[in-house]
Swiss-Prot record:
GO terms for biological process: blood coagulation; inflammatory response; negative regulation of blood coagulation; negative regulation of cell adhesion; vasodilation. It comes from the Eukaryota. Disulfide bonds join C27-C591, C82-C93, C106-C125, C141-C144, C205-C217, C228-C247, C263-C266, C327-C339, C350-C369. Its main location: secreted. Plasma. This is Kininogen-1. Keywords: Blood coagulation, Disulfide bond, Glycoprotein, Hemostasis, Inflammatory response, Phosphoprotein, Protease inhibitor, Repeat, Secreted, Signal, Thiol protease inhibitor, Vasoactive, Vasodilator. InterPro entries: Cystatin_dom (IPR000010), Cystatin_sf (IPR046350), Kininogen (IPR002395), Kininogen-type_cystatin_dom (IPR027358), Kininogen_Fetuin_HRG (IPR050735), Prot_inh_cystat_CS (IPR018073). SMART domains: CY.
Amino acid sequence: MKLITILFLCSRLLPSLTQESSQEIDCNDQDVFKAVDAALTKYNSENKSGNQFVLYRITEVARMDNPDTFYSLKYQIKEGDCPFQSNKTWQDCDYKDSAQAATGECTATVAKRGNMKFSVAIQTCLITPAEGPVVTAQYECLGCVHPISTKSPDLEPVLRYAIQYFNNNTSHSHLFDLKEVKRAQRQVVSGWNYEVNYSIAQTNCSKEEFSFLTPDCKSLSSGDTGECTDKAHVDVKLRISSFSQKCDLYPVKDFVQPPTRLCAGCPKPIPVDSPDLEEPLSHSIAKLNAEHDGAFYFKIDTVKKATVQVVAGLKYSIVFIARETTCSKGSNEELTKSCEINIHGQILHCDANVYVVPWEEKVYPTVNCQPLGQTSLMKRPPGFSPFRSVQVMKTEGSTTVSLPHSAMSPVQDEERDSGKEQGPTHGHGWDHGKQIKLHGLGLGHKHKHDQGHGHHGSHGLGHGHQKQHGLGHGHKHGHGHGKHKNKGKNNGKHYDWRTPYLASSYEDSTTSSAQTQEKTEETTLSSLAQPGVAITFPDFQDSDLIATVMPNTLPPHTESDDDWIPDIQTEPNSLAFKLISDFPETTSPKCPSRPWKPVNGVNPTVEMKESHDFDLVDALL
């Protein structure tokens, strides 16, 4: 008894020891916020340009203890108004305007060591760029401030004046030039008020040598940068009457540019529309047409990629698509630009290597092409495993396949099979010496005891000796009160199964069509319910899974095609009717957290959330 008790306790204790302690906690927890703070601070520190990102809200969090504490986090961020180079933290920044602010979602795993130390183990952020300000041609509010395009020509005199103003009023040793205009606004008054935000970059021109910017002054990638916001008033005579400027300069840290690695003789990618490819492509298509034994010329349709390599000359490696044209080789001496592509012609995928020796004026092209195949239609019969290997049997010119035999496809399949069309079909089956066992469709041997009155033999879809109700071709043994009658006068004769089997079925059957259908369905369900019954297809091959490039039209779907799938009767309160989930459903009512700050005056504790789920009220509207 003690041994049983110990085993019982061990069986209850071992599963709890093997499971990792993981639980969902409140997104507004203080430790969760510290973990997100560490993750967001690390992300902002890795960016060197633009503005910092500010926390919007925490959406998911889970804590794992094994043995250290790990937080699995998912949080949303928005672009703030503080540059990365500023000394502010993300908590001191405000959100940027919604139309101009980038957004993102981050997934991070943060470890907690000790009581206060948080370290980021892994983090991935997906950033969505801002849509930018909406620029319209007309505004309903005359005299209101409205955004304008950053590429507007009206900004050129204002920006030119602003750059000159900055260079004349700063003590920096070098001149600065405009880098990027970020946003601009304008207001129509007695003239125009402009407000422009832009970035500047240090150039290679020092103030000792240059008093103003010249075309020789170029921006330095490793120089200082800055961001300015200017306000200017332009009067009706297009003169700048007032101007104010506020700039933040960000000195670059000591940085040594690593030497670029030179690879002499390595292939370098070139644009597919480069003019340098005209000569190699012309030699490639000429080589293709000379070696191809087709009756029509080919021309290049699309260039996929191209590289050039410096060897003893130049080596071009080009991948392109060539298509057959309407110009025949018999009536045209060479390919011309007037030759149009034949949309129904052959398509080739080509790899070309062209060696160009400029000093010898020689070109050595090599072209290797393969015809492009079309997507094949896969067909799998009911109950056939998708993991079974398929061998595609190809013939010259096309792929020969046959569809699986079903209740609606024997006539079409037999007509497409030329080997079976010639000569009479002997026996009661689809092939000599083969026996088909398919219960439920009248194929194969089947015994059924019934309360019928006689011994019926009916002709139908079945072939071979079959004993059943319905459309079976053969004998059916029944135990009843009447005499045994043999109504199958044609039984024992050789039939071609392509003959109108429905007509013979109706002539030999003494029951109504409704009774026949009812008995057939009853037989189908009972036969499918028998255990250990094998379903075999004597003429089925793996190639039946592959359809031809130009498949024949299949007959329309009818209700008899659904006889492959039995109707399983289930009670509403049975276990088969109710689905039992493998794992308990988890809910997280404590997430997402409240927004960190209000967005455009929205209360952070109350947020309107759009729901795209289906509502029953929608069906009543």
